[in-house]
C-alpha cells in the first residue's frame, strides 16, 4: 500500500499538478485507509475540505457526515479537524484512489499463499489511477484563451521546428536542421 501511495505521489508531483490526497470512503467494496488523489479544478465534481496549514484533506461530503452537519459550504473557515489551521474548500477531479482490503476477500475465497514456513492469507488492496482523468485535469489547470499549456512532463514534445515553406529558394531545411542540432546540445 505504502509503495503504491508513494508511486502515485511521485506521478502527480512529476506532472506538476496542484492536487490533494484526500481521506475518502471506499464504498460498498469495504476496506480501510481509503485515499483519493484529487486534482484541484473549478470544474471538479467533488467538493474538498482541506487545511491551510497541514496535509489534512477530506471529501467535504464525508466530513459533513462525520460532523452531522447539513451544508458542506459551512465548513469554509472552520478549524481543521487535525487542529492545524482553518479549512478551505475547493473543487477537485478524482484521478486516483487507493485503499486496503485487508483479508476480507482472501478469507472469503479461502485464498492462501506460501509464506516462509506456512500458507498465509494475503492482504489485498485496491489501486486505481485514471490516465485520461490526469490529462483532463492537467488541461483544466493549464490553459488560457489560446488553448492548452502542457506541462513539460505531459507534453509530447518541448519544441517543434516547422519547415514552413519547403519549396523556398532559401535553404530552410538546412536552417531547421541547424536549429535542431543546436537544441540537442
Regions flagged by a language model, labelled:
Residues 1-185:
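NTP/phosphate- and nucleic-acid-binding module
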